[in-house]
Curated annotation (Swiss-Prot):
Organism: Photobacterium damselae subsp. damselae
Protein name as catalogued: Hemin import ATP-binding protein HmuV
Quaternary data: The complex is composed of two ATP-binding proteins (HmuV), two transmembrane proteins (HmuU) and a solute-binding protein (HmuT).
Family under the similarity heading: Belongs to the ABC transporter superfamily. Heme (hemin) importer (TC 3.A.1.14.5) family.
EC number: 7.6.2.-
Length: 265
């Protein structure tokens, strides 16, 4: 199933016929996809649907068995890695470090592709730690942080990495709210939303359908490695579609203030 194309957004990323098979299991089954600048695209689906596999193929962590990827109309393989790092940032679900860095040093790692001075890197990382709300953790040892704190420090790192991306910016988030409390879930997604409003293409793997409906411009439901639905939250989150994919009956109502769909299970 091919993606829908909006006429007033440029294509940031285009994937054609992506096929991925690991251990004899098909994880992606000839997926075609166009990701637009200036939008948040949420990848949804049950466990094992192919969401994280798709994100890892798109960001180059996993090489597909077949298919092609273009980033800003240029084949992904033609991008020098250091140049691509300025324009595409990835926040994985789990980030591990084997050294006892201070939290601000982790955030400063994002400046490595930017060719700026150490002082500029420190200032940039400090600014993004404030934005994410982890500036009070700057001098804490990274291994002593909670899972949610680590995730937010890495978000500051990714924002630092993309600081010089200009108009060509892709942000990929793999379950960015999984370790966060309610307030930090919304704060993280508000930052992603602000970036998209500035022109970035944002791709989020997320399980919470209500958060996806609230913040994403476009929802893509995957199941068994295929795109099952693709459109606006109201187009995608119908009771029938949700029950068919997740195997659970739901009701869908409109949020009383903001009119996005709310799922009641």
């Amino acid at each position: 199933m091919s993606s829908t194309l909006s006429s007033h957004h440029a294509i940031a990323l285009k994937a054609s016929n992506l096929h991925l098979q690991l251990g004899g299991k098909t994880l992606l089954d000839n997926v075609d996809l166009e990701i637009m600048s200036g939008q948040i695209t949420a990848l949804l689906g049950p466990n094992g649907a192919g969401k994280s596999s798709l994100l890892k193929v798109l960001n180059g962590e996993i090489k597909p068995n077949s298919g092609s990827i273009e980033i800003f109309s240029r084949p992904k393989d033609h991008w020098p890695s250091e140049l691509l790092a300025k324009h595409m940032g990835i926040l994985p679900q789990h980030s591990t470090l084997s050294f006892s860095f201070l939290a601000h040093e982790v955030a400063e790692l994002g400046a490595m592709p930017l060719a700026i001075s150490n002082h500029q890197a420190q200032q940039l990382a400090a600014k993004n730690m404030v934005k994410v709300g982890v500036d009070h953790l700057a001098n804490r040892l990274y291994p002593t942080l909670s899972g949610g704190e680590k995730q937010r420090v890495h978000f500051a790192r990714v924002l630092t990495q993309l600081s010089h991306s200009g108009k060509q910016c892709i942000l990929m988030l793999d379950e960015p709210t999984s370790a966060l409390d309610l307030a930090h879930q919304h704060h993280t997604l508000e930052i992603a939303q602000a970036l998209s409003q500035q022109g970035a293409a944002v791709i989020i793997v997320i399980h919470d359908l209500n958060l996806a409906a609230q913040y994403a411009d476009r929802l893509i439901i995957l199941n068994q490695g295929k795109i099952q639905a693709d459109g606006t939250p109201w187009q995608v989150l119908t009771p029938t579609a949700v029950e068919n994919v997740y195997g659970w009956p739901v009701q869908v109502i409109a949020h009383p203030e903001h009119n996005y769909p709310v799922i009641l299970a």
